[in-house]
Amino acid sequence: MELFSLSSLLLLSTLFVFYIFKFVFKRRNQRNCYMLHYECYKGMEERKLDTETCAKVVQRNKNLGLEEYRFLLRTMASSGIGEETYGPRNVLEGREDSPTLLDAHSEMDEIMFDTLDKLFHKTKGSISPSDIDILVVNVSLFAPSPSLTSRVINRYKMREDIKSYNLSGLGCSASVISIDIVQRMFETRENALALVVSTETMGPHWYCGKDRSMMLSNCLFRAGGSSVLLTNAARFKNQALMKLVTVVRAHVGSDDEAYSCCIQMEDRDGHPGFLLTKYLKKAAARALTKNLQVLLPRVLPVKELIRYAIVRALKRRTSAKREPASSGIGLNLKTGLQHFCIHPGGRAIIEGVGKSLGLTEFDIEPARMALHRFGNTSSGGLWYVLGYMEAKNRLKKGEKILMMSMGAGFESNNCVWEVLKDLDDKNVWEDSVDRYPELSRIPNPFVEKYDWINDDTMSFVRVD
């Protein structure tokens, strides 16, 4: 009898341990987030904003005087944006001062459905729209009813039990926020498939006034977007491009200057637009610092963290100037990260992040080239940078990529991906990647063609 009781107890204990291990293993698998595929939007030839087209758009704004023209053309010439970015249809048609709801819907449909059609075509035979369990769409400045997620669900006839999330007002860093939401959803759903669609409406929000701080958005932002397919299903692991390592979000919106440095508003004449203040760079640096203070200890080797701590301690003892721990000065990020996917928000942002983190020209090249070829495409911009890395055959199995995004709020949302196999898809860069980085070194046509506007002897001229 005692032997039977002992055997029963041993059996129960074994079963208990087995189910504990099974539960832990299952939870660990559910927390996995694999990237199966991503697609970026590339517009048609007639949608390109070259020198001539940009000049015509500027000249149509009758609110501008000579000084405003000078400011705009100087900004365009120094923006780091090339001749082949894409603009919204209503602006190219000369209707930027009278956009319609149809313009906004048409712009969204073109970008969302183009990227999703290509994505489903690539996964045809293994994944269909009816297999999608989670859908997240992030567009900051356009929140219609029915929602954009409903528009996608209707177009692709997705299941009735799909979990959909429509995000607005989150700026250029919204794509990483969407990935964070998906990862958290994966913890409660087994063998799930998720779509993240990231884009922005440019046409209805083109600024037609003369406030210099609000003109900047016209010079930087362009039409673009992306769709990303994610899963936590182990059966897709061998097909996956990358695996999510970690996500960190930082929000410094409690500071008034950080909150208002990038904000939608009307100017004194009632023209709506997006205000970018001189505090933007400082807010970005602060948010990025807060973020990296949490993220870097998760991905850098202990040996490098100990070395850095010792160096900082010695500096303190010798009364050396104290450097911020997360700035990258003295901390070798290459010990745990091989690639740096910086949000292509503007030349100053890219170069500022690169300098503060001690990155090389090679490291920031993908962001600079994405800005030159496609412009600032808001939350979708990171995926053009990633696409450049892949098209250049830079991404090898086992390497890690740090994605850094910043946006209104002010927020810094970063994530790290591990490459699961060598990647070489030419994607949206197929027709231009071989011309880069050389193409970006060609002098901006604005400088040569409109240099006369900087001549002070021409100040008496009236431009209309």
Curated annotation (Swiss-Prot):
Expressed in siliques. GO terms for cellular component: membrane. Belongs to the thiolase-like superfamily. Chalcone/stilbene synthases family. Its EC number is 2.3.1.199. The keyword Acyltransferase applies. One of its GO terms (molecular function) is fatty acid elongase activity. Induction: Repressed by herbicides such as flufenacet and benfuresate. Down-regulated by low temperature, osmotic stress, salt and darkness. The keyword Transmembrane helix applies. This is 3-ketoacyl-CoA synthase 19. It is found in: Membrane. InterPro entries: 3-ktacl-CoA_syn, ACP_syn_III_C, FAE1_typ3_polyketide_synth, Thiolase-like. It holds the Pfam family ACP_syn_III_C.
